């Protein structure tokens, strides 16, 4: 199967690197314009040629649009929901006992190693590192929500 796909790709290489059509200079001056050009101009080999051919002409003007993140902006409610979701997925936490104000060690019966694993899961979820000095102070979900909101500048 892979051999057939590779052979098909190799057979298409000459047409992929064939020279592009020659266009009138007037058409090349317009960025990304739709242009009609005469059939006697050169096009890729094997392409059918009607009397007039419609083509997209790339120009020198390029509009760049950067999308840094597809995620919606963070809100306090969104942070709280994500924190509780991650905690509910943790196998040592009973979801019925979990609330925003549950203390990890007193209410949920976790130890310090579990607390470190929770902080690591929060780092993965929110995409930034929580220093050990700050991580030691985060003992309940509400403290984690407040910390993340402070670091991500969410005050809604």
Swiss-Prot record:
Belongs to the acyl carrier protein (ACP) family. This is Acyl carrier protein, mitochondrial. GO terms for molecular function: acyl binding; acyl carrier activity; fatty acid binding; mitochondrial large ribosomal subunit binding; NADH dehydrogenase (ubiquinone) activity; oxidoreductase activity. InterPro entries: ACP (IPR003231), ACP-like_sf (IPR036736), PP-bd_ACP (IPR009081), Ppantetheine_attach_site (IPR006162). The gene is NDUFAB1. GO terms for cellular component: mitochondrial matrix; mitochondrial membrane; mitochondrion; respiratory chain complex I. Carrier of the growing fatty acid chain in fatty acid biosynthesis. Accessory and non-catalytic subunit of the mitochondrial membrane respiratory chain NADH dehydrogenase (Complex I), which functions in the transfer of electrons from NADH to the respiratory chain. Accessory protein, of the core iron-sulfur cluster (ISC) assembly complex, that regulates, in association with LYRM4, the stability and the cysteine desulfurase activity of NFS1 and participates in the [2Fe-2S] clusters assembly on the scaffolding protein ISCU. Residues 77-152 form the Carrier domain. It is found in: Mitochondrion. The lineage of its organism: Eukaryota, Metazoa, Chordata, Craniata, Vertebrata. One of its GO terms (biological process) is [2Fe-2S] cluster assembly. The keyword Mitochondrion applies. The modification N6-acetyllysine is found at residue 88.
